[in-house]
Amino acid sequence: MKRMLVFGLLLGLLCIPLSVNAFELGVRGYYWLPELDGEVKVDESGITGTTIDFGDDLGMDDEEYPIVEAFVGLGDHHISVSAMQVDYSGSKTLSTNIIFKGETFTTDVASSLKYDMIDAEYQYDLIDLENILAGFSIGVIGKVKWVDGEVEIKSAIETAKETFTAPIPMVGAGVHVGLIADLLEVRVKGTGIGYSGNMLYDVMGDISLTPFPLVDIHGGYRIIHLDVDVDDVELKYDMSGPYVAVTVGF
Protein backbone atom coordinates (compact mmCIF):
# COMPACT_ATOMS: atom_id res chain seq x y z
CA MET A 1 0.00 0.00 0.00
CA LYS A 2 1.19 3.49 -0.81
CA ARG A 3 1.12 4.76 2.75
CA MET A 4 3.18 1.79 4.00
CA LEU A 5 5.71 2.36 1.21
CA VAL A 6 6.06 5.98 2.30
CA PHE A 7 6.57 4.92 5.92
CA GLY A 8 9.14 2.32 4.87
CA LEU A 9 11.13 4.85 2.84
CA LEU A 10 11.14 7.30 5.72
CA LEU A 11 12.32 4.64 8.13
CA GLY A 12 15.03 3.76 5.65
CA LEU A 13 16.39 7.29 5.93
CA LEU A 14 16.88 6.72 9.63
CA CYS A 15 19.08 3.73 8.90
CA ILE A 16 21.69 5.70 6.95
CA PRO A 17 24.98 5.29 8.84
CA LEU A 18 26.00 8.28 10.92
CA SER A 19 29.34 9.23 12.39
CA VAL A 20 30.43 7.93 15.76
CA ASN A 21 29.51 11.34 17.17
CA ALA A 22 25.77 10.66 16.68
CA PHE A 23 23.92 12.30 19.54
CA GLU A 24 20.98 9.91 19.78
CA LEU A 25 19.34 6.91 18.17
CA GLY A 26 16.30 5.06 19.39
CA VAL A 27 12.64 4.13 19.32
CA ARG A 28 9.69 5.35 21.32
CA GLY A 29 6.32 3.70 21.87
CA TYR A 30 3.25 5.68 22.96
CA TYR A 31 -0.17 4.64 24.23
CA TRP A 32 -2.57 7.55 23.69
CA LEU A 33 -6.04 7.91 25.22
CA PRO A 34 -7.65 10.77 23.25
CA GLU A 35 -11.19 12.09 23.37
CA LEU A 36 -12.84 12.52 19.96
CA ASP A 37 -14.75 15.71 19.17
CA GLY A 38 -15.60 16.55 15.59
CA GLU A 39 -18.03 17.00 12.75
CA VAL A 40 -18.04 16.60 8.99
CA LYS A 41 -20.07 18.00 6.10
CA VAL A 42 -19.74 16.70 2.53
CA ASP A 43 -21.60 18.20 -0.44
CA GLU A 44 -22.00 16.42 -3.78
CA SER A 45 -23.18 17.61 -7.22
CA GLY A 46 -24.85 20.72 -5.84
CA ILE A 47 -26.57 18.83 -2.99
CA THR A 48 -25.69 20.48 0.33
CA GLY A 49 -24.69 18.03 3.02
CA THR A 50 -25.68 17.99 6.67
CA THR A 51 -23.19 18.98 9.35
CA ILE A 52 -22.81 15.63 11.13
CA ASP A 53 -21.36 15.20 14.63
CA PHE A 54 -19.21 12.08 14.98
CA GLY A 55 -20.44 11.32 18.49
CA ASP A 56 -23.96 12.73 18.78
CA ASP A 57 -25.16 11.82 15.27
CA LEU A 58 -23.08 8.74 14.41
CA GLY A 59 -22.48 7.19 17.84
CA MET A 60 -18.70 7.05 17.62
CA ASP A 61 -16.99 6.51 20.98
CA ASP A 62 -13.50 7.40 22.21
CA GLU A 63 -10.75 4.89 21.44
CA GLU A 64 -7.14 4.30 22.51
CA TYR A 65 -4.22 4.11 20.09
CA PRO A 66 -0.57 3.02 20.04
CA ILE A 67 1.99 5.21 18.26
CA VAL A 68 5.46 4.10 17.17
CA GLU A 69 8.33 6.55 16.63
CA ALA A 70 11.92 6.11 15.45
CA PHE A 71 14.42 8.93 15.93
CA VAL A 72 18.02 9.85 15.27
CA GLY A 73 20.07 12.94 16.10
CA LEU A 74 23.49 14.33 15.28
CA GLY A 75 24.57 17.42 17.20
CA ASP A 76 21.88 20.06 16.82
CA HIS A 77 20.04 18.09 14.14
CA HIS A 78 17.19 15.71 15.00
CA ILE A 79 15.02 13.57 12.70
CA SER A 80 12.04 11.46 13.70
CA VAL A 81 9.33 9.43 11.97
CA SER A 82 6.17 8.29 13.74
CA ALA A 83 3.08 6.37 12.66
CA MET A 84 -0.44 5.87 14.00
CA GLN A 85 -3.52 4.04 12.69
CA VAL A 86 -6.90 5.49 13.72
CA ASP A 87 -10.13 3.50 13.51
CA TYR A 88 -13.41 4.85 14.91
CA SER A 89 -16.78 3.23 14.33
CA GLY A 90 -20.31 3.70 15.57
CA SER A 91 -23.98 2.98 15.01
CA LYS A 92 -27.01 5.14 15.63
CA THR A 93 -30.75 5.36 15.10
CA LEU A 94 -31.17 8.77 13.49
CA SER A 95 -33.55 11.27 15.07
CA THR A 96 -33.57 13.35 11.87
CA ASN A 97 -32.54 12.79 8.27
CA ILE A 98 -28.92 13.47 7.31
CA ILE A 99 -27.36 14.06 3.90
CA PHE A 100 -23.79 12.89 3.27
CA LYS A 101 -22.12 13.10 -0.14
CA GLY A 102 -25.44 13.41 -1.95
CA GLU A 103 -27.09 10.46 -0.18
CA THR A 104 -29.96 10.85 2.30
CA PHE A 105 -30.03 8.62 5.37
CA THR A 106 -33.28 8.30 7.31
CA THR A 107 -32.96 5.37 9.71
CA ASP A 108 -30.34 3.21 11.43
CA VAL A 109 -26.79 3.88 10.21
CA ALA A 110 -23.36 2.41 10.79
CA SER A 111 -20.35 4.65 10.28
CA SER A 112 -16.57 4.63 10.40
CA LEU A 113 -13.67 7.06 10.41
CA LYS A 114 -10.34 5.47 9.51
CA TYR A 115 -6.99 6.94 8.63
CA ASP A 116 -3.25 6.40 8.82
CA MET A 117 -1.09 9.30 10.01
CA ILE A 118 2.66 9.49 9.45
CA ASP A 119 4.75 12.37 10.82
CA ALA A 120 8.22 13.04 9.39
CA GLU A 121 9.92 15.71 11.49
CA TYR A 122 13.20 17.63 11.50
CA GLN A 123 14.33 19.82 14.41
CA TYR A 124 17.32 22.14 14.56
CA ASP A 125 18.40 23.38 17.99
CA LEU A 126 18.92 27.15 18.03
CA ILE A 127 19.93 27.12 21.69
CA ASP A 128 21.61 24.04 23.12
CA LEU A 129 22.79 24.04 26.72
CA GLU A 130 22.56 20.29 27.21
CA ASN A 131 26.02 20.19 28.78
CA ILE A 132 25.25 22.92 31.33
CA LEU A 133 23.48 22.14 34.60
CA ALA A 134 20.54 19.78 33.95
CA GLY A 135 20.22 20.77 30.28
CA PHE A 136 18.11 23.15 28.20
CA SER A 137 17.44 23.50 24.48
CA ILE A 138 15.11 25.34 22.09
CA GLY A 139 14.70 24.28 18.48
CA VAL A 140 12.74 25.07 15.34
CA ILE A 141 10.74 22.27 13.72
CA GLY A 142 9.72 21.48 10.17
CA LYS A 143 7.29 18.61 9.71
CA VAL A 144 5.24 16.86 7.06
CA LYS A 145 2.10 15.13 8.32
CA TRP A 146 0.83 12.53 5.86
CA VAL A 147 -2.85 11.60 6.35
CA ASP A 148 -4.64 8.92 4.32
CA GLY A 149 -8.13 7.78 5.23
CA GLU A 150 -11.88 7.68 4.75
CA VAL A 151 -15.25 8.48 6.31
CA GLU A 152 -18.11 6.10 5.54
CA ILE A 153 -21.81 6.07 6.41
CA LYS A 154 -24.11 3.22 5.44
CA SER A 155 -27.63 2.01 6.07
CA ALA A 156 -29.53 -1.04 4.86
CA ILE A 157 -30.08 0.60 1.46
CA GLU A 158 -27.49 3.39 1.09
CA THR A 159 -23.70 3.69 1.37
CA ALA A 160 -21.59 6.82 0.98
CA LYS A 161 -17.85 7.21 1.43
CA GLU A 162 -15.45 10.16 1.31
CA THR A 163 -11.71 9.51 1.07
CA PHE A 164 -8.89 11.92 1.83
CA THR A 165 -5.14 11.87 1.27
CA ALA A 166 -2.82 14.78 1.92
CA PRO A 167 0.78 15.61 2.80
CA ILE A 168 0.53 18.64 5.11
CA PRO A 169 3.63 20.81 5.76
CA MET A 170 3.89 22.28 9.26
CA VAL A 171 6.32 24.43 11.23
CA GLY A 172 6.81 24.95 14.95
CA ALA A 173 9.17 24.81 17.89
CA GLY A 174 10.33 22.48 20.62
CA VAL A 175 11.68 23.05 24.13
CA HIS A 176 13.55 20.60 26.35
CA VAL A 177 14.32 21.29 30.01
CA GLY A 178 16.30 19.02 32.29
CA LEU A 179 15.06 19.21 35.88
CA ILE A 180 17.44 16.69 37.38
CA ALA A 181 20.46 15.79 35.26
CA ASP A 182 19.97 12.45 33.47
CA LEU A 183 16.92 11.63 35.62
CA LEU A 184 13.97 13.98 35.12
CA GLU A 185 13.15 16.04 32.01
CA VAL A 186 10.32 18.09 30.49
CA ARG A 187 9.64 18.24 26.76
CA VAL A 188 7.15 20.49 24.95
CA LYS A 189 6.71 20.87 21.20
CA GLY A 190 4.11 22.17 18.81
CA THR A 191 3.67 22.48 15.07
CA GLY A 192 0.93 23.97 12.94
CA ILE A 193 -0.20 25.62 9.74
CA GLY A 194 -2.97 28.06 8.89
CA TYR A 195 -4.16 29.33 5.50
CA SER A 196 -7.38 30.73 3.99
CA GLY A 197 -9.38 30.07 7.15
CA ASN A 198 -8.08 26.49 7.48
CA MET A 199 -6.03 25.43 10.49
CA LEU A 200 -4.12 22.40 11.74
CA TYR A 201 -1.98 22.16 14.85
CA ASP A 202 -0.37 19.35 16.83
CA VAL A 203 0.86 20.13 20.36
CA MET A 204 2.29 17.79 22.97
CA GLY A 205 4.15 17.97 26.25
CA ASP A 206 5.43 15.42 28.73
CA ILE A 207 7.65 14.78 31.71
CA SER A 208 10.03 11.84 31.59
CA LEU A 209 11.91 9.79 34.15
CA THR A 210 15.07 7.81 33.44
CA PRO A 211 15.00 4.91 35.93
CA PHE A 212 18.13 3.36 34.43
CA PRO A 213 20.42 4.05 31.45
CA LEU A 214 18.95 3.95 27.92
CA VAL A 215 15.31 3.85 29.07
CA ASP A 216 12.91 6.78 29.64
CA ILE A 217 9.33 6.58 30.90
CA HIS A 218 7.01 9.44 29.86
CA GLY A 219 3.65 10.80 30.90
CA GLY A 220 2.12 13.60 28.87
CA TYR A 221 -0.75 15.18 26.96
CA ARG A 222 -1.33 15.66 23.21
CA ILE A 223 -3.78 17.73 21.16
CA ILE A 224 -4.42 17.45 17.42
CA HIS A 225 -6.80 20.06 15.97
CA LEU A 226 -8.00 20.17 12.37
CA ASP A 227 -10.40 22.70 10.84
CA VAL A 228 -10.57 22.66 7.03
CA ASP A 229 -13.02 23.69 4.32
CA VAL A 230 -11.78 22.45 0.95
CA ASP A 231 -13.91 21.99 -2.17
CA ASP A 232 -17.07 20.17 -1.02
CA VAL A 233 -15.73 18.96 2.33
CA GLU A 234 -15.84 20.69 5.72
CA LEU A 235 -14.11 18.91 8.59
CA LYS A 236 -13.65 20.04 12.18
CA TYR A 237 -11.81 17.52 14.27
CA ASP A 238 -10.12 17.34 17.67
CA MET A 239 -8.28 14.51 19.38
CA SER A 240 -6.90 15.34 22.82
CA GLY A 241 -5.89 13.35 25.84
CA PRO A 242 -3.12 11.91 28.01
CA TYR A 243 -0.51 9.40 26.95
CA VAL A 244 2.20 7.22 28.40
CA ALA A 245 5.37 6.31 26.52
CA VAL A 246 8.59 4.35 26.80
CA THR A 247 11.81 5.35 25.01
CA VAL A 248 14.79 3.11 24.37
CA GLY A 249 17.70 5.19 23.12
CA PHE A 250 21.43 4.92 22.54
Per-range role (PLM):
Residues 24, 119-120, 209, 238-250:
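Outer-membrane beta-barrel "beta-signal"
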Residues 27-29, 70, 79-81, 122, ...:
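Membrane-embedded beta-strand positions of outer-membrane beta-barrel proteins
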Residues 35-63, 85-117, 147-166, 195, ...:
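Extracellular/periplasm-exposed beta-strand and loop segments of Gram-negative cell-envelope proteins
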Residues 132, 165-167, 191-202:
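Solvent-exposed loop/turn segments connecting transmembrane beta-strands
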